[in-house]
Amino acid sequence: HVANDLRRWQRILFDHGWGATMWPAEFGGTGWDKTRQYLFDIECVTGDAPIQLPFGLKMVAPVLMAYGSDAQKSRFLPRILDGTDWWCQGYSEPGSGSDLASLKTRADRDGDHYVVNGQKAWNTLGQHADWIFCLVRTDPSAKPQRGISFLLIDMKTPGIRVQPTRLLDGRHEVNEIFFDDVRVPGGN
């Protein structure tokens, strides 16, 4: 199964100290410069090695490194690095595509949680994800380009439903993800 193979490959790289060639050493990466990263990537391609999924390693991790709290960094980065947690992206929405200013998925504050309602589309391999990093509207009164927040949501949270989208080739590599009163801790 593709998901198991990719997780296993990430674990092998991690065990050899190569789990994140693009990460700084302070976060468990190699700390390599761009040239060494490129040479490593070329060797992996030449050896027909599996890919490393970008969602955790190259998309959410750099955001956490730059803007996350110390608690978020210690909670999420090691599990991304060793392949324990699989991530997917929650940006696009039906009828909006990648126009983030028009996103409609809402996250309303309720005490120390957000309550998320809405739908995301074109979530690559989301059916295998443990977590989704999601853009949500937290201030509907703000200009469309503002009032948007970045939440980290556990895919096992009650109220989440993943529906595969059949592609022209018959595969199910993308999904729609529905959020129905999904409670997310404010610290995420």
Language-model segment annotations:
Residues 105-108:
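A structural signal for short hydrophobic beta-strand segments in well-ordered beta-sheet cores
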Residues 102, 156-183:
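Flexible, small-/acidic-enriched active-site or ligand-binding loops
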Residues 83-91, 135:
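A short, Trp-centered hydrophobic/proline-enriched beta-strand micro-motif
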Residues 95-103:
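Active-site-adjacent elements of ketosynthase-type condensing enzymes
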Residues 7-84, 124-131:
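Internal helix-loop-helix
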Residues 97, 121-126, 168-169:
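Glycine-rich phosphate/pyrophosphate-binding beta-alpha loops
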Residues 113, 117-161:
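A short core secondary-structure module
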